[in-house]
Regions:
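Beta->alpha turn/N-cap motifs
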Residues: 37, 61-65, 81-93, 140, ...
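Short beta-strand->loop
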Residues: 29-34, 131-141, 153, 161-165, ...
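Short, polar/charged alpha-helical segment
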Residues: 25, 34-60, 90-93, 144-149
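N-terminal signal peptide c-region/cleavage motif recognized by signal peptidases
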Residues: 17-19
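A local structural motif
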Residues: 23-27, 49-62, 76-78, 100, ...
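Short helix-initiation/N-cap motifs at beta->coil->alpha
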Residues: 59-70, 83-85, 124, 158-174, ...
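Pocket-lining segment of extracytoplasmic ligand-binding domains
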Residues: 85-86, 167-171, 175-207
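Flexible hinge/capping segments at coil-to-helix
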Residues: 118-133
Length: 207
C-alpha cells in the first residue's frame, strides 16, 4: 500500500509523464529493508522512470509500517510503502491529525501479515493461539493488526514478548515464544536460514 501527503503521489506511482522541467524531489520510505517487495520501487528508479517523469526520488529503508505511516504524517517523508493495518491504526488513534496519510494504491492482493508457529507446538488453527505467548517487534504490522485477527477467530488471553526484528524468528526456533507475527514470506525465509524447514512451519494468514 502506498501513502502520500500530496496529490503528486498518484502521478509518481502511475509514472505519468510530466513536463521535462526541474526535477520534483520526492522522499519515499519503505516499510522494511531492501527486500523483494521493494523491487517495484527500486527497479523503477534504476531504469530512470522517475527521472523521465520529472521526479527526483530518494528511497530509504524503513523499520516497520507503523514508523513509515508516522513519518509521512509528520512530513519527514512525502510518500511511503506500508501495511494497511498501520494506516488504519494511525487514523483511529489520531483523528485530529492535520496531515493524515491516505492510501492511493494497493500492492498486495491480500495482506502478507500472518501468524507463524512450529508444527511441533501443536498450533494448527487460529483458535489454538488462545493462552499462548506470541512474539514480535512492537511496530510489526502483523502485531498491530492482530486484534482484528484475534476477534475474528475468538483468540483470547494472548501474551506478547517484544524483541528486535533479527531476534523474532530466532526466538521461535528456540521455543522461547509459541508463535510470531510478521509478513509470511519474510519470516519463512528467516526461519529457513535458522535451519527450520518450511514443512515444519504452520502459517495462519490474516486473509
Amino acid at each position: 500500500m502506498q501513502l502520500t501527503r500530496r496529490s503528486l503521489a498518484v502521478a509518481a506511482l502511475a509514472l505519468a509523464a510530466l513536463p521535462a522541467a526541474a526535477q520534483t524531489p520526492i522522499k519515499f520510505q519503505l516499510d522494511w529493508r531492501f527486500e523483494g517487495p521493494a523491487a517495484l520501487f527500486l527497479a523503477s528508479d534504476a531504469k530512470g522512470y522517475y527521472k523521465a517523469a520529472g521526479l527526483n526520488v530518494t528511497i530509504d529503508a524503513g523499520n516497520g509500517s507503523g514508523g513509515t505511516v508516522q513519518r509521512v504524517a509528520s512530513g519527514t517523508y512525502d510518500m511511503g510503502f506500508a501495511d494497511l493495518a498501520a494506516l488504519m491504526e494511525f487514523h483511529a488513534n489520531n483523528p485530529d491529525a492535520p496531515n493524515k496519510p491516505v492510501a492511493v494504491m494497493m500492492v498486495y492482493n491480500n495482506t502478507p501479515a500472518a501468524v507463524l508457529a512450529l508444527k511441533k507446538s501443536g498450533i494448527a488453527k487460529p483458535a489454538d493461539l488462545s493462552g499462548k505467548k506470541l512474539g514480535a517487534p512492537v511496530f510489526d504490522a502483523g502485531r498491530r493488526g492482530f486484534p482484528i485477527f484475534a476477534k475474528a477467530n475468538n483468540v483470547q488471553n494472548v501474551t506478547w514478548t517484544s524483541m528486535d526484528p533479527p531476534l523474532r524468528e530466532t526466538m521461535l526456533a528456540r521455543g522461547e515464544v509459541d508463535a510470531i507475527t510478521g509478513f509470511s514470506f519474510t519470516s519463512l525465509l528467516n526461519l529457513e536460514a535458522r535451519n527450520v524447514k518450511a514443512q515444519d512451519v504452520v502459517i495462519l494468514p490474516y486473509s
